[in-house]
Amino acid sequence: MKMQSPKMEQEEVEEERMRNKWPWMKAAQLMEFRMQALVYRYIEAGLRVPHHLVVPIWNSLALSSSSNYNYHSSSLLSNKGVTHIDTLETEPTRCRRTDGKKWRCSNTVLLFEKYCERHMHRGRKRSRKLVESSSEVASSSTKYDNTYGLDRYNESQSHLHGTISGSSNAQVVTIASLPSARSCENVIRPSLVISEFTNKSVSHGRKNMEMSYDDFINEKEASMCVGVVPLQGDESKPSVQKFFPEVSDKCLEAAKFSSNRKNDIIARSREWKNMNVNGGLFHGIHFSPDTVLQERGCFRLQGVETDNEPGRCRRTDGKKWRCSKDVLSGQKYCDKHMHRGMKKKHPVDTTNSHENAGFSPLTVETAVRSVVPCKDGDDQKHSVSVMGITLPRVSDEKSTSSCSTDTTITDTALRGEDDDEEYLSLFSPGV
């Protein structure tokens, strides 16, 4: 039996006391306890807790069965204020990209992120559509609230910085206003605004140089046609060609494309504004000034109708039938249907002074001559002449005002002849 020092014996006694007071912890529990103590030291020092120390604690909280322990531990260990059990992720180191159903990415997340390297920035580039190569040049205009600048090219930054550093007070250069600018022949005149961030040693802000010039493009390969530009005082600086030597064909094409597109939009708006009856949307289709399909001074798209048979009468029954006769010259209907329905608008007024007397205004003008045998002493035959007999008014309740005048006269004349026969029968010999 080995002899132990009094100090070692005292330590063993203390260990036995601790064993009796506290139960033994497992190896995993002891490791977790040490990690928690290390996390506490980070928090006490005011430093950010490393990710590899927090993840095992999250896993242990998720696998734990005690809800109270989960609640208190999550509220203590989370520096973002996580107080609910549902917010805890069962696999915090796994990427959260899913398809909305069962699939989930199995890659490991990045440090302090929720997604892996593959799915980290997914979907950001979909917000802008890639139309043409020129749209990429024009897309940077919205970033600085100006048209496209040359800030992407490193050479332009070096040249601009070397030129502007000489005179820091000159912030805006307008070449068109300077007397030294010379002109060229057959040149398009666009405008260009160049936005550039200068070095912090010169200026901490942004210097905008608006350049509107007369002669920008003669050909695609042509150089700048602007003379020497004095920036301040009597000093002479390099020309615009040396100012921006890296102006490429791509930039020139972008400027020309923007100018042509603007002119095209202006031309279309003028066409719509000045549109009249004879100038419509569809070329080759012109409307008559008197047509009902077109109103003067405005163009209605729903009023445009194409007639397959322009020379045919347009009278229809509203379904399938249509008149087959030819129209009159300069009209839409034939001679039969031209004035149909016009008399219905003005009904004939038959009321006059003869209605009060009960007699018809019509009088039989024809002389009715008949030979009536009369018996007298001499057995002579006398001829009786009946002329201008005023006929009583015959009212036909069934007749309407739309009937023609000829029909009314005929009906009245027929009824008048019947009355004449009754009147002449009085002179017959049998009476």
From Swiss-Prot:
SMART domains: QLQ
GO CC term (a single one): nucleus
Subcellular location: Nucleus
Induction remark: microRNA 396 (miR396a or miR396b) negatively regulates growth-regulating factors (GRF1-4 and GRF7-9).
Keywords (A to Z) from UniProt: Activator, Nucleus, Repeat, Transcription, Transcription regulation
GO molecular function term, any single one: ATP binding
Bipartite nuclear localization signal, short sequence motif: residues: 94-104, 122-129, 312-322, 340-345
Tissue expression per record: Detected in the shoot apical meristem (SAM) and in young leaf primordium.
BP term (GO), one: regulation of DNA-templated transcription
Domain WRC: 89-133, 307-351
Keyword Nucleus recorded: yes
All copies of domain QLQ, residue ranges: 24-59
Family listed: Belongs to the GRF family.
Domain free text: The QLQ domain and WRC domain may be involved in protein-protein interaction and DNA-binding, respectively.
Complex and partners: Interacts with GIF1.
Record function comment: Transcription activator that plays a role in the regulation of cell expansion in leaf and cotyledons tissues. Component of a network formed by miR396, the GRFs and their interacting factors (GIFs) acting in the regulation of meristem function, at least partially through the control of cell proliferation.
Protein's name in the database: Growth-regulating factor 9
Species: Arabidopsis thaliana
